[in-house]
Amino acid sequence: MRATFLFLCLIAGFAQADPRGDELAQAADRQLHGHGDSESRLVMTLISPRGETATRELRVRSREQDGAERTLMIFDTPRDVAGTALLSESGPQGEDQQWLYLPAVKRVKQIGSRNRSGPFMASEFAFEDIATPYWQKYRHRYLRDEKCGVLDCHVLEREPLDENSGYSRQLVWLDRADKLVRRIEFHDRQGNLVKTYTATGFQRHQGRFWRPAEMLMVNARNGRQTRLAWSGFRFGIGLAESDFNQNALQRVK
């Protein structure tokens, strides 16, 4: 009986939230949300271990509604992927949903929850990395403060609550001044470091919305990299709800 009681106490201890970790995660979340709608341009560069590159150009649109966000990514170049589009729907509760339109077969394919850990369009970003994150979908723990480059940062550990996530945990570096996510280390289900994300060149748009100019994902296993270069941010442009559903995927231009 005593052993059982101690075991239950241990489980309860692990389940307890870390107030400081949650507080910092919420502060970082506030930098991502509240923009209403937006659009931007994106250049995706795939980089091989030998330094060979392949470039893709995209348009990205997003719209917030009822506490959730939908994001539409449309490939314009190169020709073999032009017209391919990914629609992601994410929110603080429930499973994220994603649909991929493939123009070659004129078909919309839903990305199943068990497949979201797979690579997005041959990049080092997984489908689950593309969906807008919400702090409620992780268990957080504050670890320490330390330098990250020239900045002072908080370091958090977060564990995905989604049992189908490809990650067991992520280490997140937030700068202390603005609570912007500067670095993430992703660990697989076996606890091994699988890739590292860094964000640089942050700019504040309209005096409120922080966005990075560049994101870099580096695969620790094979040396491949994917660089995302962002530009042309516009906010509050009046995108319609009808632009963010499965039917809209087949008529994107």
PLM regions: where:
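Sec-dependent signal peptide recognition
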Residues: 1-7
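N-terminal signal peptide c-region/cleavage motif recognized by signal peptidases
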Residues: 12-14
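Boundary of Sec targeting at the N-terminus
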Residues: 16-18
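N-terminal mature ectodomain segment of secretory-pathway/periplasmic proteins
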Residues: 20-104
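Gly/Pro-enriched, hydrophobic low-complexity segments
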Residues: 26, 76, 87, 97-101, ...
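Short amphipathic beta-strand and strand-loop transition segments with alternating hydrophobic
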Residues: 59-63, 141-147, 200-203
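Internal active-site segments that recognize and position negatively charged phosphoryl groups
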Residues: 138
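Short, solvent-exposed mixed-charge patches
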Residues: 252-253
